[in-house]
Structure formats: structure tokens, C-alpha cells
């Protein structure tokens, strides 16, 4: 195994280890490197809701590379061409949002693997991931080391969860709390008891199927719940939210008329 392609995050999931992560939404390679020095097991670079370009994602991968924290990229959608670009710039772990059916899951699996087992386009000679053609046996090893996580975040996805979990090539399933709570009729209220019950049941179903289960919890108490339910890759904060909260707390120390800092419990 070429060390450049080795995926410690995937290895940790296979061993059943609990890995704690942080969401990166600032689009800044400088902020990404600061986060990488903190010691989180994984760092999610958000290309869905944060205004990241492919170049932005590329620069953040470069910034994180010297450190132990493992990057995970979330593309804006499970588009085949977009997935190809993200993998070519060096992503080894993807979190693909809005997967509602087993058929969608199979399409994403295919897009992330080279032929004959998938349909990923071949361009290793111009790809950072293959060090511009210098990594021997790149295509076979890239298939083996790719870690694919998908997001289940709608009522439809929950109805299809068992079928999704049977799809080969998926390493983990991530429960998207914000979109899921909205889909269930509780927008911006992932803490509602009905939503909490569904989250717990889903995490337990995912783990029972032999897959890793993931979650984003900006509320530490919710993170602890998810870990207790069996989630084993959990993001415990969002960089932009932590930054705004710290700014508000500091200002409130010196200006009595400033707005009191609010601790959000949802993303």
C-alpha cells in the first residue's frame, strides 16, 4: 500500500473506533490548517452549504495534509462529474448529501470507483491524487482506499434506509439532523422528542447493519447522546459557529448594550 493513498479514517471506521470531527465552513485554507493543529480525528470541508470552489477545496486539502487530522469532503451533490473532480484533487473520503434511495446510493458508489467496478473517469496523469501519474498502481489502490459516506436526511431516505444499507461500497451513513427534522415537520428543531427518537433508531439500525454511523451535533449534550447510541464518527462543532460565538462572548464582556451570545443547539 502506497502511504499517500492510505486512509486512516477508513481504517478507524473498520476497527469500530470512535472518531471526533469538526465542520469547516469558512472556505479558508488558513482556518483549515489552524483546525488541523487542534487534533480532531477528521475535518469536514463543506462544499454543500459553504461557498467553496474546487480550488478552495484543493487548497484546504493541501493545508490539512501535513497533520494527523483526516479530511472529509462534502460535495454540493452526488453529481458524477463533481465527484470525479473532488477525488482527482486528492479527497479519499467523501460525504455525499441527499441520498434518498438505494439506486442513488449505487450511482454514487459507481461514480467513486474506477472501472471495471465503477465508472469514475480516468485522468491520473493530471491528478494531485495520483501525484500527477507518479503513484504506481494508483487506480486499484484508490478503489480500495476510498471511503464513502452518504447522508440520510429525509423521510423518504428513512423509508429506504434498509435498502440503502444493503448497497455494497458504502462505509458509513450520516444522519443529517437539520434537513431530517425539517422533512419530519419540525424545521430547525432537531431536539424535538419525535426527531430525537428517529435519530436514535436510525443510528442503531445503521450500526446493526455493520456500517459506521455519523452525526453533526453542535450541542455537546446531543453529541454525547449520539455517541451513547452508537454513532462512531461525530462532528462536535462548526468553525464559523464557534467563531461567531467566541466573538459575541468577548464583545459582551466589554459592551453592556451588545446582544447576549446565543448558544445554538442546531446547525
From Swiss-Prot:
Keyword Metal-binding belongs to the record: yes
EC id: 4.1.2.53
Domain of life assignment: Bacteria
Catalytic site positions: 49 (proton acceptor)
Catalytic activity: 2-dehydro-3-deoxy-L-rhamnonate = (S)-lactaldehyde + pyruvate
Binding site for substrate: 151, 178-179
InterPro entries xrefs: Aldolase/citrate-lyase_domain (IPR005000), HpcH-HpaI_aldolase (IPR050251), KDR_aldolase (IPR023593), Pyrv/PenolPyrv_kinase-like_dom (IPR015813), Pyrv_kinase-like_dom_sf (IPR040442)
GO cellular component: cytoplasm
Pfam families for the chain: HpcH_HpaI
Cofactor info, note text: Binds 1 Mg(2+) ion per subunit.
GO MF annotations in UniProt: 2-keto-3-deoxy-L-rhamnonate aldolase activity; magnesium ion binding
Keyword Endoplasmic reticulum: no
Binding of Mg(2+), residues: 153, 179
Site (Increases basicity of active site His): residue numbering on this chain: 88
Cofactor(s) needed: Mg(2+)
Residue(s) at site: Transition state stabilizer: 74
Keywords (A to Z) from UniProt: Lyase, Magnesium, Metal-binding
Role noted for this protein: Catalyzes the reversible retro-aldol cleavage of 2-keto-3-deoxy-L-rhamnonate (KDR) to pyruvate and lactaldehyde.
Membership in a protein family: Belongs to the HpcH/HpaI aldolase family. KDR aldolase subfamily.
Complex and partners: Homohexamer.
Protein's name in the database: 2-keto-3-deoxy-L-rhamnonate aldolase
Taxonomic lineage from the root: Bacteria, Pseudomonadati, Pseudomonadota, Gammaproteobacteria, Enterobacterales
Gene: rhmA
Amino acid at each position: 500500500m502506497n502511504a499517500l493513498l492510505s486512509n486512516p479514517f477508513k481504517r478507524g471506521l473498520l476497527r469500530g473506533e470512535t472518531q471526533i470531527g469538526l465542520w469547516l465552513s469558512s472556505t479558508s485554507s488558513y482556518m483549515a490548517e489552524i483546525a488541523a493543529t487542534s487534533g480532531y480525528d477528521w475535518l469536514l470541508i463543506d462544499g454543500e452549504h459553504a461557498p467553496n470552489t474546487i480550488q478552495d477545496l484543493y487548497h484546504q486539502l493541501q493545508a490539512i495534509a501535513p497533520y494527523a487530522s483526516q479530511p472529509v469532503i462534502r460535495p454540493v451533490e452526488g453529481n458524477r462529474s463533481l465527484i470525479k473532480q473532488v477525488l482527482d484533487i486528492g479527497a479519499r473520503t467523501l460525504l455525499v448529501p441527499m441520498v434518498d434511495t438505494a439506486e442513488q446510493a449505487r450511482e454514487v458508489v459507481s461514480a467513486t470507483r474506477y472501472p471495471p467496478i465503477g465508472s469514475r473517469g480516468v485522468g491520473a496523469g493530471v491528478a494531485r491524487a495520483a501525484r500527477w501519474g507518479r503513484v504506481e498502481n494508483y487506480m486499484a489502490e484508490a478503489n480500495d482506499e476510498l471511503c464513502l459516506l452518504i447522508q440520510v436526511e429525509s423521510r423518504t431516505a428513512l423509508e429506504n434506509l434498509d435498502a440503502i444499507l444493503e448497497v455494497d461500497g458504502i462505509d458509513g451513513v450520516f444522519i443529517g439532523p437539520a434537513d431530517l427534522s425539517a422533512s419530519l415537520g419540525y424545521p430547525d428543531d432537531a431536539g424535538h422528542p419525535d426527531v430525537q427518537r428517529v435519530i436514535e433508531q436510525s443510528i442503531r439500525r445503521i450500526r446493526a447493519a455493520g456500517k459506521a454511523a455519523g452525526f453533526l451535533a453542535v450541542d455537546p449534550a446531543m453529541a454525547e447522546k449520539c455517541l451513547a447510541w452508537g454513532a462512531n464518527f461525530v462532528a462536535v462543532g462548526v468553525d464559523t459557529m464557534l467563531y461567531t460565538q467566541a466573538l459575541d462572548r468577548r464583545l459582551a464582556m466589554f459592551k453592556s448594550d451588545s446582544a447576549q451570545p446565543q448558544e445554538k443547539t442546531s446547525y
